[in-house]
């Protein structure tokens, strides 16, 4: 049977603790220590926790306070050296650095405490919303907070107007900041060589249209000829006897105002002997009018969306063609130039041809450049005294006022037309500059702008005319900050670069994502009709093989 063994109890009547010390521990020196203490520490920093002398050594740790385990090196007089202990003068920043750091730490701590307090007092659903808001705020700051330039928005890469092939060689590169510094003043007065076509008179009833008396835009089926330079029979005839640089007003306006462009575009240059021909590619988008190209956030819809950049450009071109004919007195008296329209055949109905006149003009740029340009007028207008004024008719269209920092035309066009034109200048600076250059080259007395909006925001097929406005090209150029000297300087620079090239075909291409234009040399046969036929035959053969 188990029994209880009473232990030996030591009674110390004069104190506390054991009465006797075992023999093996008698007379042994002891110093409190910790396993975390380093042996032979250079200095003991653990004892300086409290700076107030009233609490010195009261709560300090005594571990490692002795010198039993310290390592002492023998004195070596050779290593003795004097040290300069004089205090250096601190700068104002160094003196206040700790003060600012402590202030920032206190501020951050207060914010964290306040945030924690707010989270504690919110209900559960509100807590989740607050945490989600803080998470999104941190994400936004991480993405955009470190940017130095707030105007650099994240834009997806744009496509080039033409695919650059591997066998194309870069001959020259010009950046926009360099082109913006160009100036050229030695431009002679233009000389009219030949005038062709017939113009209809402008209907002044369109000047009285307001937002309250809007007029539907009609679809007018007329033929518009957009013939390139080398296909123009008049230019071919003139090139035999005079001139060494040939182009159309649309091509030159693209070059003269290129520093405002954002989207990619291209122009074909042919060097034949000592002559230069500026052309556009067949079946290209060169004649399409861009929409909100220079806006801070241009349209970026993709696919078949009616607000995609290409569909908006086709809509704007459709509106411009119809308005330029609807605002004329169609079917009535015409103003005829001495020569007929060179692109109209004899068996064609004259009423099916759009009202347009061609003025072939000549400029002398110095002693070596003889420039011949085909310019266009869209209509003619009679003044109060019966004088005749030639006009260019263009159209600005509203597609959705909620985008691109737009202004609602139906509310602002009559009362604040200046705000509307200022917004359009910001969003369509390049397009307005091109139109102004074309009017200046043609010598038009006025530039007519029509304001056309969608009948409904979601319907891109029906439109209404909300008003018109008239400008003198020179005055409008000053309003939109278009320097005519800079425009001629850019053109002269491009011509000089192309004149230095060898005979052949070249391409001037605006980079789709950079402010730079490049000149590429093209192999023989590029962009020719024979090459297009071969590509079509290859595509047909591939389709037949797939079907087989």
From Swiss-Prot:
Q: Which GO terms describe its biological process?
A: cap-dependent translational initiation; formation of cytoplasmic translation initiation complex; IRES-dependent viral translational initiation; translational initiation; viral translational termination-reinitiation
Tell me the GO molecular function terms. mRNA cap binding; RNA binding; translation initiation factor activity
Q: Where is this region: Disordered?
A: 523-548
Question: Where would one find the signal peptide in this protein?
Answer: none
Where in the sequence does UniProt note compositional bias of the Acidic residues kind? 529-548
Family, similarity comment: Belongs to the eIF-3 subunit D family.
Known role: mRNA cap-binding component of the eukaryotic translation initiation factor 3 (eIF-3) complex, a complex required for several steps in the initiation of protein synthesis of a specialized repertoire of mRNAs. The eIF-3 complex associates with the 40S ribosome and facilitates the recruitment of eIF-1, eIF-1A, eIF-2:GTP:methionyl-tRNAi and eIF-5 to form the 43S pre-initiation complex (43S PIC). The eIF-3 complex stimulates mRNA recruitment to the 43S PIC and scanning of the mRNA for AUG recognition.
Can you say what this protein is called? Eukaryotic translation initiation factor 3 subunit D
Instruction: List the lineage, top down.
Output: Eukaryota, Metazoa, Chordata, Craniata, Vertebrata
């Amino acid at each position: 049977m188990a029994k209880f063994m009473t232990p030996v109890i030591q009674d110390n009547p004069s104190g506390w603790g054991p009465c006797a010390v075992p023999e093996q521990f008698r007379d042994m020196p002891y110093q409190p220590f910790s396993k975390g203490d380093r042996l032979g520490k250079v200095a003991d920093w653990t004892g300086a926790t409290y700076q107030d002398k009233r609490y010195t050594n009261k709560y300090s740790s005594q571990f490692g306070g002795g010198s039993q385990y310290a390592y002492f090196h023998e004195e070596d007089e050779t290593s003795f050296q004097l040290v300069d202990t004089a205090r250096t003068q601190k700068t104002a920043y160094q003196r206040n650095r700790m003060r600012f750091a402590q202030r920032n730490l206190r501020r951050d701590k207060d914010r964290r405490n306040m945030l924690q307090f707010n989270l504690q007092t919110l209900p559960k659903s509100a807590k989740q919303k607050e945490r989600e808001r803080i998470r999104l705020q941190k994400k936004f700051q991480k993405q955009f907070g470190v940017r130095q330039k707030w105007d650099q928005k994240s834009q997806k890469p744009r496509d080039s107007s033409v695919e650059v092939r591997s066998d194309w060689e870069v001959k020259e590169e010009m950046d926009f900041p360099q082109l913006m510094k160009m100036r050229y003043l030695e431009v002679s007065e233009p000389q009219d060589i030949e005038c062709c076509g017939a113009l209809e008179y402008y209907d002044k009833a369109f000047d009285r249209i307001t937002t309250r008396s809007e007029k539907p835009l009609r679809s007018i089926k007329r033929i518009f000829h957009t013939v390139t330079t080398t296909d123009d029979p008049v230019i071919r005839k003139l090139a035999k006897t005079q001139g060494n640089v040939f182009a159309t007003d649309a091509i030159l306006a693209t070059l003269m105002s290129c520093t405002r462009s954002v989207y990619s575009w291209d122009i074909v240059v042919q060097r034949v002997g000592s002559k230069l021909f500026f052309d556009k590619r067949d079946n290209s988008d060169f004649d399409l009018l861009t929409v909100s190209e220079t806006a801070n956030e241009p349209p970026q819809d993709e696919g078949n969306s009616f607000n995609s950049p290409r569909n908006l450009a086709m809509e704007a071109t459709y509106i411009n063609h119809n308005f330029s004919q609807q605002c004329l007195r169609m079917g009535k008296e015409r103003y005829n130039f001495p020569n007929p329209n060179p692109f109209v055949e004899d068996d064609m109905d004259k009423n099916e041809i759009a009202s347009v006149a061609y003025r072939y003009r000549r400029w002398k740029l110095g002693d070596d450049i003889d420039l011949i340009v085909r310019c266009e007028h869209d209509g003619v207008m009679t003044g109060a005294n019966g004088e005749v004024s030639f006009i260019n008719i263009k159209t600005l269209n509203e597609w959705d006022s909620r985008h691109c920092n737009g202004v609602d035309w139906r509310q602002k066009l009559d009362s604040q037309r200046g705000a509307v034109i200022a917004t359009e200048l910001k969003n369509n600076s390049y397009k307005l500059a091109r139109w102004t250059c074309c009017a200046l080259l043609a010598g038009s007395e006025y530039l007519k702008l029509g304001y056309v909006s969608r009948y409904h925001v979601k319907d891109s097929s029906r439109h209404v005319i909300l008003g018109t406005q008239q400008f003198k090209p020179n005055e409008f150029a000053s309003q939109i900050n278009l320097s005519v000297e800079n425009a001629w300087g850019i053109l002269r620079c491009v011509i000089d670069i192309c004149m230095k090239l060898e005979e052949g075909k070249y391409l001037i291409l605006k980079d789709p994502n950079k402010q730079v234009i490049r000149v590429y040399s093209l192999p023989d046969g590029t962009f020719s009709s024979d090459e297009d036929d071969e590509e079509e035959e290859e595509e047909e053969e591939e389709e037949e093989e797939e079907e087989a």
